Amino acid sequence: RLENFPLENWWDDISVGLTGAFLCTKYYGTEISKNSDGGVIINISSDLGLIAPDQRLYEQTGMQKDEQPVKPVSYSVIKSGLIGFTRYLATYWPDRVRCNTLCPGGVDDGLPEKFVEKVARKIPQARLARPDEYQGALIFLLSDSSKYMNGATISIDGGRSVW
């Protein structure tokens, strides 16, 4: 819960999710920006970088409201931060490095069935993704077919973020 979320956890999450992306980009982006062909950076965000998590999805029966589990605040902050960071990068190396963000939705990879059913009701396609449904977008973003895309945010979430 937000009111009980330890500051140490916040810093740990931000360190991995945002500082890690910053450091990777700082060194990799600097190197590929020197190449005549440049390169591509794809930051992986989430549909929860575009929309707020519906905390009701995490509710469990028999628990008091102040004890209910929630999606940690740091997750959405990191994922939306990656979108902003990508937009910044698109203007920083615009002629050498293409920087885009992929925002996948949830993946049905063994989550509890009742949770999957609750989430699926929030998605126009009424299901979570299969693990192989993101690879086409990644291949496209890495290819010359997307050479004019820079600073874009691509959502692959079955329509969840349109609500």
Language-model segments: which ranges?
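Conserved SDR Rossmann-fold cofactor-binding beta-strand/turn motif
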Residues: 98-108, 142, 155-157
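Short, small/polar-rich loop/turn modules that mediate ligand/substrate recognition or access, typified
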Residues: 94-98, 149-151
